[in-house]
Amino acid sequence: MSGGKPRSNTRTVAMLAGVVVLMGALSWAAVPFYSWFCKVTGFAGTTNVAEAASDTVLDEKIRVRFDANADSNLGWTFRPMQREMELKIGENAIAFYEAINNTDEPVTGTASYNVAPDAAGYFFNKIECFCFTEQTLQPGERVEMPVSFFVDADLVNDRDAGRIRDITLSYTFHRTDPPAPKQAALDAKTEPTVN
């Protein structure tokens, strides 16, 4: 009987170690898998990237609203240059966003984006976008940043998205470079202390 227990304990330890390794591997793979899943399905408002404008333009119109947000530590003013745009489904359009660096130092940022309602994300195609690369603005610099897009004509045939005629394209700019030592010291002073 005592010969069976060590083998049983060894097997249990090996199985538990395998479970731990499997959980670690799944945790590591979850983020890239979720990103891939969102790009393929348009889940969570993820948009597509198109190589060229659509070949199919319908007579039906759709309204696209534009939204802009900037992370508080960015130091930029960021806003859409038009609140909304009405266009034909499948028609290529260009919208502009304005960014102003209000700091006394160069700041690099990147924009994350989303489309609402989520079901429209799969049909919202960007051809060119400032969100594809990091943007660096010099102190006081003002830029107009374009986004070229279209809403795929297949939207009207989709069971979930077929009735959508209002879409919101939203961007949030985040700082990607570490703040200068002077700014980091100011940020540290303003952070509340927790006891």
From Swiss-Prot:
What membrane topology term does the record carry? Single-pass type II membrane protein
Which residue ranges does the entry give as Cytoplasmic-facing topology?
A: 1-7
Q: Which InterPro entries match?
A: CtaG/Cox11_dom_sf, Cyt_c_oxidase_assmbl_CtaG
State if Cell cycle is listed as a keyword: no
Q: What is its main location?
A: membrane
Concerning SUPFAM superfamilies, the annotation shows: Ctag/Cox11
Q: Name one GO biological process term.
A: respiratory chain complex IV assembly
Single annotated GO MF: copper ion binding
Q: Which residues cross the membrane?
A: 8-30
Write out the annotated subcellular location: Cell inner membrane
Name it: Cytochrome c oxidase assembly protein CtaG
